Design a protein with these regions (language model features):
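A hydrophobic/aromatic-rich effector-binding and dimerization subdomain
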Residues: 84-148
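Generic protein-terminus/edge-of-domain signal
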Residues: 1-59, 63-66
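Short beta-strand His + acidic residue motifs that chelate non-heme Fe in jelly-roll/DSBH
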Residues: 57-59, 81-88
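Histidine-centered metal-chelating micro-motifs
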Residues: 73, 77-83, 103-104
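Amphipathic alpha-helix face/heptad-repeat signature
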Residues: 132, 139, 155, 159-162, ...
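A cytosolic small-molecule/anion-sensing beta-strand core signal
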Residues: 52, 69, 77
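Short, Lys/Arg-enriched, Trp-marked, Pro/Gly-tolerant hinge/linker segments that flank
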Residues: 127, 150-158, 170-196
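Amphipathic, well-ordered alpha-helical segments in soluble domains
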Residues: 47, 135-142, 162, 166-169
Protein backbone atom coordinates (compact mmCIF):
# COMPACT_ATOMS: atom_id res chain seq x y z
CA UNK A 1 0.00 0.00 0.00
CA UNK A 2 1.40 3.40 -0.99
CA UNK A 3 2.06 5.92 1.80
CA UNK A 4 1.31 9.52 0.89
CA UNK A 5 3.22 12.06 2.99
CA UNK A 6 0.88 15.04 3.27
CA UNK A 7 3.13 17.69 4.79
CA UNK A 8 1.26 20.60 3.24
CA UNK A 9 -2.18 21.59 2.07
CA UNK A 10 -0.69 22.23 -1.36
CA UNK A 11 0.42 18.58 -1.52
CA UNK A 12 -3.06 17.42 -0.51
CA UNK A 13 -4.65 19.52 -3.26
CA UNK A 14 -2.15 18.29 -5.85
CA UNK A 15 -2.54 14.60 -4.94
CA UNK A 16 -6.34 14.76 -4.95
CA UNK A 17 -6.53 17.21 -7.88
CA UNK A 18 -8.34 19.94 -5.93
CA UNK A 19 -7.98 23.74 -6.18
CA UNK A 20 -5.27 25.25 -3.98
CA UNK A 21 -5.73 28.74 -2.50
CA UNK A 22 -3.64 29.17 0.69
CA UNK A 23 -0.50 27.42 2.00
CA UNK A 24 -1.70 27.11 5.62
CA UNK A 25 -5.49 26.76 5.50
CA UNK A 26 -8.04 25.51 3.01
CA UNK A 27 -11.56 24.32 2.42
CA UNK A 28 -11.83 21.39 0.03
CA UNK A 29 -14.79 19.73 -1.61
CA UNK A 30 -14.88 16.40 -3.38
CA UNK A 31 -17.66 14.92 -5.50
CA UNK A 32 -15.45 12.89 -7.84
CA UNK A 33 -14.82 9.14 -7.98
CA UNK A 34 -11.73 8.02 -6.07
CA UNK A 35 -8.80 7.72 -8.50
CA UNK A 36 -6.28 6.21 -6.11
CA UNK A 37 -5.92 2.56 -5.25
CA UNK A 38 -5.80 1.76 -1.51
CA UNK A 39 -3.38 4.14 0.18
CA UNK A 40 -2.11 5.36 3.53
CA UNK A 41 -1.81 9.00 4.56
CA UNK A 42 0.68 10.42 7.01
CA UNK A 43 -1.00 13.70 8.01
CA UNK A 44 1.18 16.80 8.41
CA UNK A 45 -1.70 19.13 9.32
CA UNK A 46 -5.17 19.09 10.87
CA UNK A 47 -8.08 17.93 8.74
CA UNK A 48 -11.78 17.75 9.53
CA UNK A 49 -14.12 16.27 6.92
CA UNK A 50 -17.90 16.47 6.75
CA UNK A 51 -18.93 13.37 4.84
CA UNK A 52 -22.25 13.25 3.07
CA UNK A 53 -21.71 9.59 2.25
CA UNK A 54 -19.27 6.97 3.55
CA UNK A 55 -17.31 6.05 0.43
CA UNK A 56 -14.27 4.32 1.91
CA UNK A 57 -13.03 2.29 4.82
CA UNK A 58 -10.55 4.01 7.13
CA UNK A 59 -8.13 2.13 9.36
CA UNK A 60 -5.94 3.45 12.20
CA UNK A 61 -3.33 0.76 12.83
CA UNK A 62 -5.48 -2.38 13.10
CA UNK A 63 -8.60 -0.54 14.23
CA UNK A 64 -11.28 0.36 11.75
CA UNK A 65 -12.59 3.92 12.04
CA UNK A 66 -16.35 3.82 12.68
CA UNK A 67 -17.95 6.29 10.29
CA UNK A 68 -21.00 6.46 8.06
CA UNK A 69 -23.15 8.82 6.06
CA UNK A 70 -23.63 12.34 7.46
CA UNK A 71 -20.63 12.13 9.75
CA UNK A 72 -17.45 13.98 10.68
CA UNK A 73 -13.99 12.48 10.73
CA UNK A 74 -10.88 14.29 11.94
CA UNK A 75 -7.12 13.80 11.69
CA UNK A 76 -4.16 15.50 13.39
CA UNK A 77 -0.52 15.96 12.40
CA UNK A 78 1.47 12.76 12.79
CA UNK A 79 -1.48 10.41 12.46
CA UNK A 80 -1.25 7.67 9.86
CA UNK A 81 -4.31 5.93 8.48
CA UNK A 82 -5.26 3.72 5.56
CA UNK A 83 -8.06 4.42 3.09
CA UNK A 84 -9.74 2.01 0.71
CA UNK A 85 -12.58 3.01 -1.60
CA UNK A 86 -15.89 1.16 -1.36
CA UNK A 87 -16.81 0.04 -4.89
CA UNK A 88 -19.82 1.90 -6.31
CA UNK A 89 -19.70 4.70 -3.72
CA UNK A 90 -18.25 7.98 -4.94
CA UNK A 91 -16.87 10.32 -2.27
CA UNK A 92 -18.94 13.34 -1.35
CA UNK A 93 -17.45 15.55 1.35
CA UNK A 94 -16.20 18.97 2.33
CA UNK A 95 -13.29 19.55 4.64
CA UNK A 96 -11.29 22.15 6.51
CA UNK A 97 -7.52 21.71 6.43
CA UNK A 98 -5.07 23.82 8.42
CA UNK A 99 -1.42 23.66 9.36
CA UNK A 100 -0.40 24.06 13.03
CA UNK A 101 1.53 27.20 12.02
CA UNK A 102 -1.76 28.86 11.03
CA UNK A 103 -3.14 28.68 14.57
CA UNK A 104 0.14 29.29 16.42
CA UNK A 105 -0.29 32.04 19.03
CA UNK A 106 -4.10 32.10 18.74
CA UNK A 107 -6.80 31.00 21.16
CA UNK A 108 -7.44 28.03 18.88
CA UNK A 109 -3.75 27.12 18.96
CA UNK A 110 -3.71 27.24 22.76
CA UNK A 111 -6.88 25.12 23.01
CA UNK A 112 -6.47 22.63 20.17
CA UNK A 113 -5.64 19.73 22.51
CA UNK A 114 -9.04 19.99 24.20
CA UNK A 115 -10.71 18.85 20.98
CA UNK A 116 -10.49 15.12 21.67
CA UNK A 117 -11.86 14.10 18.27
CA UNK A 118 -8.33 14.71 16.94
CA UNK A 119 -6.86 12.16 19.38
CA UNK A 120 -5.44 8.94 17.97
CA UNK A 121 -7.54 7.02 20.49
CA UNK A 122 -10.70 8.46 18.95
CA UNK A 123 -11.74 6.02 16.26
CA UNK A 124 -15.40 6.88 16.06
CA UNK A 125 -16.87 9.50 13.80
CA UNK A 126 -19.38 12.07 14.90
CA UNK A 127 -22.74 11.05 13.43
CA UNK A 128 -24.92 14.08 12.75
CA UNK A 129 -28.64 14.78 12.69
CA UNK A 130 -29.87 16.70 9.61
CA UNK A 131 -29.91 20.02 11.50
CA UNK A 132 -26.42 19.41 12.94
CA UNK A 133 -25.17 18.55 9.45
CA UNK A 134 -26.52 21.89 8.13
CA UNK A 135 -24.84 23.85 10.94
CA UNK A 136 -21.45 22.24 10.28
CA UNK A 137 -21.84 22.65 6.51
CA UNK A 138 -22.70 26.35 6.95
CA UNK A 139 -19.66 26.98 9.14
CA UNK A 140 -17.36 25.31 6.60
CA UNK A 141 -18.92 27.44 3.86
CA UNK A 142 -18.29 30.60 5.92
CA UNK A 143 -14.62 29.64 6.26
CA UNK A 144 -14.42 28.94 2.51
CA UNK A 145 -16.05 32.27 1.67
CA UNK A 146 -13.60 34.10 3.93
CA UNK A 147 -10.71 32.41 2.09
CA UNK A 148 -12.10 33.62 -1.25
CA UNK A 149 -12.32 37.25 -0.11
CA UNK A 150 -9.51 39.78 -0.33
CA UNK A 151 -7.16 39.40 2.64
CA UNK A 152 -7.12 42.16 5.26
CA UNK A 153 -6.09 42.64 8.89
CA UNK A 154 -9.13 40.68 10.10
CA UNK A 155 -8.93 37.62 7.80
CA UNK A 156 -6.67 35.42 9.94
CA UNK A 157 -8.60 36.08 13.16
CA UNK A 158 -12.00 35.53 11.54
CA UNK A 159 -10.89 32.22 10.00
CA UNK A 160 -9.40 31.00 13.32
CA UNK A 161 -12.52 32.07 15.22
CA UNK A 162 -14.79 30.24 12.78
CA UNK A 163 -12.66 27.09 12.91
CA UNK A 164 -12.87 27.24 16.71
CA UNK A 165 -16.66 27.75 16.52
CA UNK A 166 -16.85 24.75 14.18
CA UNK A 167 -14.91 22.65 16.70
CA UNK A 168 -17.03 23.88 19.61
CA UNK A 169 -20.16 22.73 17.77
CA UNK A 170 -18.47 19.37 17.13
CA UNK A 171 -17.77 19.00 20.87
CA UNK A 172 -21.40 19.83 21.61
CA UNK A 173 -22.64 17.26 19.09
CA UNK A 174 -20.15 14.61 20.34
CA UNK A 175 -21.42 15.18 23.88
CA UNK A 176 -24.99 14.68 22.63
CA UNK A 177 -24.02 11.52 20.74
CA UNK A 178 -22.27 9.90 23.70
CA UNK A 179 -24.89 11.09 26.20
CA UNK A 180 -27.60 9.39 24.14
CA UNK A 181 -25.51 6.22 23.93
CA UNK A 182 -24.88 6.29 27.69
CA UNK A 183 -28.63 6.65 28.34
CA UNK A 184 -29.39 3.78 25.96
CA UNK A 185 -26.81 1.53 27.64
CA UNK A 186 -28.14 2.47 31.09
CA UNK A 187 -31.69 1.63 29.95
CA UNK A 188 -30.58 -1.79 28.65
CA UNK A 189 -28.78 -2.50 31.93
CA UNK A 190 -31.86 -1.44 33.93
CA UNK A 191 -34.12 -3.76 31.92
CA UNK A 192 -31.65 -6.61 32.36
CA UNK A 193 -31.56 -6.05 36.13
CA UNK A 194 -35.37 -5.99 36.21
CA UNK A 195 -35.44 -9.37 34.48
CA UNK A 196 -33.18 -10.83 37.14
Amino acid sequence: MDVIELNSIETYCRVFELPFTHPLVGVVECNEPEKLKPYMINWGFYALFLKDMASCTITYGKTRYDHGDKSIIAFAPGQVCAFEAIPGKDPKFVGVLFHPDFIHGTGLGRNILRYSFFAYSSNEALHLSPSEFRIIRNLIEIIGTELEMATDDHTHGIICDNIQLLFDYCVRFYDRQFSERHELNRDVLQRFENLL
